[in-house]
């Protein structure tokens, strides 16, 4: 395919540009502007390469001429004592003629050295002419070329071989360039190693860093210890609606100001647990104390936990805050307690706190939140056994009676079943919303 010029490329259609790119081995599925740019770049590159090849061929031809002249001068000096010389073009070797092979037509005898010199001049002129304008070789020219120097053809390659030679000569040059550009890794590593600090320097630097860090921490802690706000803690009675454990913790956090990282971490963990408890057990918090009358009166004591515990997920240290801790504060009213100290006391581990002593009289004097059962209780064990036996017998009788007449569901049974399904569905949705039940994938 003929490669068009740069001016012709602008006038070509997009489809023609694509076909041209495909034929040249370039990417064709580009936008028109990018494709045109790529083709122009390729054509320029090819033209530059062609010019370089021409320059190389000219330089190689001139070098070949020089070598020819040198070789011819050497051969003249060598062949003056010899009587005759033969040269076969195909084998490219000087052959000493035997008496048997003298009958062949390929040998030419030269007696005088002057004739030999004239022959060589003519040959060199013919070679230059053929190098510039290639023409079909005749038999007469072949005969003339046969009487050339001995090793000239072997040393000087033909036109076909010249391009190969030039390409090969250019390759080692490229290799040399790459060898120069490759970095000396040994030197690089040595320089990098020298830049690195020694172990002693590293330890000194670390010590300085730690000393600076400790001094900064000391400076931060000094204003906290000195400038604590000396305010008496107000006596807390029964918990109001607004004073939930979460709100207490928030107020403590506000009054604290900048506290140490360890206490902050503990506070964060407590906060998380309190939030999770608030999500899971909303009815058992102190905030819903006013809704006691709305509940059913037949509640068991196991469920009633508003007075004893604050929240399900909080540690025992939090539960103690409401009752026993207030007594200690009122007893030691002379001792000043800053908000910072208060938080540390509140965030003690449940292991360090002692269990609260159960007061029987106080618990009995408290009014019941439910109506106790009046009258006789049913016997627990017997009723259980009898129920099981009765159910078993009834089931057998039922199957005996109705194995030929299948039991049809009544509308009431269907309604009850639907209601039960709705209740289960509602409970499941509420559980998922509160994070009690994991959502099914």
Swiss-Prot record:
Residues recorded with modification Phosphoserine: 124, 135, 240, 247, 255, 269, 276, 311, 352, 363
Q: What does this protein do?
A: Microtubule-associated protein with the capacity to bundle and stabilize microtubules. May associate with chromosomes and promote the organization of mitotic spindle microtubules around them.
- Motif stretch (KEN box): 384-390
Subunit structure of this chain's protein: Interacts with DNA and microtubules. Microtubule bundling is inhibited by IPO7, KPNA2 and KPNB1 while association with DNA is also inhibited by IPO7 and KPNA2.
Q: What is the lineage of its organism?
A: Eukaryota, Metazoa, Chordata, Craniata, Vertebrata
Q: Which cellular component, as a GO term, is one annotated location?
A: chromosome
GO terms in the biological process aspect are:
establishment of mitotic spindle localization; mitotic chromosome condensation; mitotic cytokinesis; mitotic sister chromatid segregation; positive regulation of mitotic nuclear division
Chain spans, region Disordered: 47-186, 216-267, 286-319, 401-427
Basic and acidic residues bias locations: 117-126, 152-171, 409-424
Molecular function via GO: DNA binding; microtubule binding; RNA binding
Family named by the database record: Belongs to the NUSAP family.
The identity of this protein, by name, is: Nucleolar and spindle-associated protein 1
Record region (Interaction with microtubules): 237-382
Q: Where in the cell is it found?
A: Cytoplasm; Nucleus, Nucleolus; Cytoplasm, Cytoskeleton, Spindle; Chromosome
**Residues recorded as bearing N6-acetyllysine in the entry:** 411
